[in-house]
Amino acid sequence: MTNPTILYPSYHNVLAHPIRLDSFFDPFVETFKDLKGAWEEFGKTGYMDPLKQHLQIAWDTSQNGTVDYLALTKASISLIGLIPGADAVVPFINMFVDFIFPKLFGRGSQQNAQAQFFELIIEKVKELVDEDFRNFTLNNLLNYLDGMQTALSHFQNDVQIAICQGEQPGLMLDQTPTACTPTTDHLISVRESFKDARTTIETALPHFKNPMLSTNDNTPDFNSDTVLLTLPMYTTGATLNLILHQGYIQFAERWKSVNYDESFINQTKVDLQRRIQDYSTTVSTTFEKFKPTLNPSNKESVNKYNRYVRSMTLQSLDIAATWPTLDNVNYPSNVDIQLDQTRLVFSDVAGPWEGNDNITSNIIDVLTPINTGIGFQESSDLRKFTYPRIELQSMQFHGQYVNSKSVEHCYSDGLKLNYKNKTITAGVSNIDESNQNNKHNYGPVINSPITDINVNSQNSQYLDLNSVMVNGGQKVTGCSPLSSNGNSNNAALPNQKINVIYSVQSNDKPEKHADTYRKWGYMSSHIPYDLVPENVIGDIDPDTKQPSLLLKGFPAEKGYGDSIAYVSEPLNGANAVKLTSYQVLQMEVTNQTTQKYRIRIRYATGGDTAASIWFHIIGPSGNDLTNEGHNFSSVSSRNKMFVQGNNGKYVLNILTDSIELPSGQQTILIQNTNSQDLFLDRIEFISLPSTSTPTSTNFVEPESLEKIINQVNQLFSSSSQTELAHTVSDYKIDQVVLKVNALSDDVFGVEKKALRKLVNQAKQLSKARNVLVGGNFEKGHEWALSREATMVANHELFKGDHLLLPPPTLYPSYAYQKIDESKLKSNTRYTVSGFIAQSEHLEVVVSRYGKEVHDMLDIPYEEALPISSDESPNCCKPAACQCSSCDGSQSDSHFFSYSIDVGSLQSDVNLGIEFGLRIAKPNGFAKISNLEIKEDRPLTEKEIKKVQRKEQKWKKAFNQEQAEVATTLQPTLDQINALYQNEDWNGSVHPASDYQHLSAVVVPTLPKQRHWFMEGREGEHVVLTQQFQQALDRAFQQIEEQNLIHNGNLANGLTDWTVTGDAQLTIFDEDPVLELAHWDASISQTIEIMDFEGRHRIQTACTWKRQRNSYRSTWRKRLETMTFNTTSFTTQEQTFYFEGDTVDVHVQSENNTFLIDSVELIEIIEE
C-alpha cells in the first residue's frame, strides 16, 4: 500500500450516520439509564430478577474501573420518586439495600461481605485525600453491619411476600408470578419488620462515628484522625434509615385500602422529618468542626483544605443535600426528582513546581479581570469562588522554553479557556522575543470534558522544567523532566468535570536558578458532569412521547442580579443567594413544551422571620404570566418542615399551585419585599399531569364536505390522482387529512373513507418524490440525530409525531441527513422545505458545493386555530404574526423553502446534498417535521453556466485538499510500509521491525477528524487515520509476539518483572517509561526458550532504549552487558549466542536515575 490516493477516495463514501464520539461519562450514563429502567419495572411489578441482573452489571462495571460504584449509588437516590404512586407496588428501599449490601457479587477483602460497600468508601476517600489511614479497621462494625443487612433483608422479603413476589419453589418453568394485593396480615408483617429494621439501624448508627472504639462504648463521637472516613459511613447509614422510612410510608399508603393505621403512619412521617433534620445537623456541624483553617497564600494549607472539603462534599454533603427530598409530605412520590448542585470542589494545586508544598501560593482568579498587574484578581480566596454560569468547551496551555545562563527553563506560563460565549486568556507575558533561544507556543486544544490536571517538575542547577498533564497523563505543555523531583496527584473525581482552571504563582523557588513569577501552576474547580448553566424544563419521555412528570430544582446561584451576594450553605449543594431588602434575583428558564407547573421556592430568612416575596414571570411574548406578592409566616409560627443551614432554617413554600407556561423563554423575577435578608436556595418546577381534554371538530354541513372534497382534489395534478400538484407541500397534505378526519362519521362516513384513501395516496406520493428518507421522522428514517433529540406526539399543529431538538446544553442538538448522489439528477434544481411549529436559534444548512443555504430561524410560539373546512391551515392564533405567515410570505414563517442546484453528478466522491438543522445557542430549541427535498425543474442554460462555475471552484478546492492530505500522509505511509514485508499491511512485519520503529510513527491529525456539522461525531478523515492505526496495531501485535521478554514494552506496568528497590513507571512525552531512581534499583526476568533443540545455536537481538547512567544484562552461566551513558533516549542492539534454553535478563542502574522505554529479545534462527 504505497500510494495515499488508494486510501483517499474511501472517506468520501462515508455512511450518512458518522460514528458518535464517546464522552468520558458515557459508561456511567448508560449504566445508570439501564438501572433506571430496571427499577421502573421492579417498582411496578416487584419482580426482582431483571433488577438483580442490572445490579450485577453495575457492580461488574465498577470492578473493572468503567464506572464509580459509589457515584452510581449516590445518583440512584434520585430515582426514589420515579414510579407513579398509583403504579408502585414496592418501595425504593428494596433496591437501595442491594446497593449498600452487594451480597450478590462476592466478598470484600474483609471476612464479612456486608462491609464491602464501606470498604469502597474507605478506598475512595484515600484516593481523594491522598492518605493511607493505615490503622483504620471496620472490625468493630461488622456485627452492626451484619445486623443491619439481616433486618433490612427481612423487610425486603416481607414486602416481596406481601405482593406475591417472594422466592418461588423450583420447577416453575419460565413463569413470572403476577403481583397481588397484600392481605392485612401481610401488611402487619411489613410494619413489624420495618420497626425491627429501624431499631437495628438506629442502634448501630452512633457507632459509625468512631468504629475504632469498643462496641461497649455508649458515647462514640467523631475523631479528627478518622472523620474523613467515618462521616461518609455515617451518612450512608443515615441514608438507609431515611429511605427505609420513606419506603415504608410509600408502601403503606399504596395499600391503604387494605389496612391503614393512620396514626402510626402520621407519626412515622413526623419521625422521618425529624431524622432528616437531626442527621443534617450532625453532618453539617461535624463538617464545620473538623474543617482545616485555610491560609490562601500557602500551597500546603490550600491543598489540605481542598482535600478535606472535596472528600466531605463528594462522600457526604452531596448525599445529605438530597435528604429533604425523601420527605413524603413535601415531595411527591410520582415524579422524577432532579436537583442541580452548583457547589464547587477544588483540586490540589498542581505546580508551579512539585517536591515541597510549603511554599507561597498566589491564586489568580481568571474570571475577575482588573486593569492592573497581570490583568486578573490576585491573592484570591477560593472560599469566595462561586459557580460562574458558564460551560467550559475546551482549553489550551501555553508553554515557553528559554535557555538562559546555561539553565534550561521550560514550563507553562499561561492558558486559554474557551467557553460557549467567551474566551479567557491569561498569562503569556514577559516573553523576550529578541532572545532566539526563547521558544513559546500554545499546546493542543483539549476538548471537554476534562477530569484532572497535574504537574510533574524537575529542578536542578541546570534544569528548571515542568510539564502539565490532563485526563490521566496527557501532556499538554512544558518539558517532561528527565528525573522528577515530584508530581501532583490529582485523580479524576467521580462524575465531576473541570469548569474553571485558576492560575497559581509562587514567589518561592526550589533552586536559586529557577524562575518564579513566570512559571504557573494550576488549581481546577469541579462541578457535576451533568450540570449546565441553562435551566430547562418541559422534558419529553421518549417512551410515551409525552411531557415527563419531573421535579426540577434550580439553585438560585444560577440566577443573577445587581450586587448580589452569595453565602456558603454546604448542606444545600449550592451557595445561597442573599437578597437584601428589595433586591431582585433574575433567572432565565427554557420551557420545551406547553404544560402546567407548580412552582415552589426554598429559602431561609434572617432571624427565621416571616418572608415577603414578589414573584413575576414574563412569558416568551413579553407578557406577564404572573405578577404578585406572597407573604409567608415565620418558621416558628407554624409546624413547618425545615433544615437548619448556616444562615437560617430552610423551608419550602408554594409560589403558584398551578400555572400554564407556554413553550419558550421564561424570565423569572424574585424580589425580597421584606426588611430582613432573604436567603434563596432554589426554585422548583413540578410538572403536573394534563387534565385537559383535546377539543375535536365535527363537520356535518354539506358545504364543509364540498370544500374538503375540493381541497383533496387540489392535491393532485390531474383527475387520475396519480401525481401530486407541483405546488403541494407535504405539510399541506397533513393539513388536509386533519380536515378529512374532522368529517362526521355518522353523516359522511362513506365519503370520509373515500377521501381518507385519497389523502393516504397523496402522502405516499409525497414520500416517493422526497429524496430524504423519513421527512416526518417516521420509522425507518435515515436521519442522524443528536442523542437528546426526541419525538413528541399530540401537537395540534402536526399530524402525527414531530421532532423536538432540545437546547444544546450538555450535548449538541441537531438533525442531519445526506442525500446520496445516486438519487440526484444532473442540471436540476431541488426544493428544500419544511414546517416549524416553534424555534429559537434554529440554524438551517443545505450544502452541496459549500453551504448554499445557511439561515437562522426564530419562529415564535403560537397556538393552533380550530380545524376549519376552508383552505386556511390551523396555524396559528395571532401572536407575533398572522395566519398568512404559514404560506412562506412572512419573515418569521412557520413554513420554509429554499432552492439548491445540482450540476453534473460527482458519483466518484458521492458529493450528494447535505441537509442539517441544529440549535445554535444553549437556550434554543425547535419543533419540526414535514421536511422535504424534491425535484423542482431542469436548470436553464444560464443557471447551468452558473452552477458550472461553482463546480469548478469546488473541484479546485477539493483537489487541493486531496493533495494536501496526501502530502501530510506520505511520511507516515512510508514509515508503516517500512514495517511490513512487501508493504503489505495485512501481511507479516519485517524481522528487523521493533518497538522503536513503531514509536517513531506519528499518525497525523487531519483537518476533518470531526464532522463539519454534527459536533461530537467523527469526520470523514477519521476513516484514513483509523486504517493507519489498525496497521500499527497489527504490527505491534506481531512485534509483541516475537519478543521473548514478557511485557517488554511495559504496556502492562511491571507485570512479569521482578522489582528491587525504587523502580516505578512514569510518563515521559505521553509514553510510560520505567524509572530506576538510584543505583540500588533493578528489574529482572527469566525467560525459557520454548522448543529449544539441544545445542542448536540461536542468535538473539536485544534492543534497549534508555536515558542516563548505565545498564547491565546478565545471561545464565554467561555474562553479557550493554552499557548506556547518554543524556537522551538511545537505542542499542547487540547479538548474543548461547546454547541453553534459559535466559536471565537484569536491568540495573549504576548511578542515579535510569529510564527504560522498552526491552526486546528476539530469536533469529540461523539457516
Curated annotation (Swiss-Prot):
SUPFAM superfamilies: delta-Endotoxin (insectocide), N-terminal domain, Galactose-binding domain-like. InterPro entries: Cry_V, Galactose-bd-like_sf, Pest_crys_dom-III, Pest_crys_dom_I, Pest_crys_N_sf. The keyword Kinase does not apply. Signal peptide: none annotated. Keywords: Sporulation, Toxin, Virulence. Pfam families: Cry1Ac_D5 (PF17997), Endotoxin_C (PF03944), Endotoxin_N (PF03945). GO terms for biological process: sporulation resulting in formation of a cellular spore; symbiont-mediated killing of host cell. Gene3D superfamilies: 2.100.10.40, Galactose-binding domain-like (2.60.120.260), Pesticidal crystal protein, N-terminal domain (1.20.190.10). GO terms for molecular function: toxin activity. The keyword Coiled coil does not apply. Toxic segment of the protein is located in the N-terminus. Endotoxin with nematicidal activity. Belongs to the delta endotoxin family. This is Pesticidal crystal protein Cry21Aa. It comes from Bacillus thuringiensis.
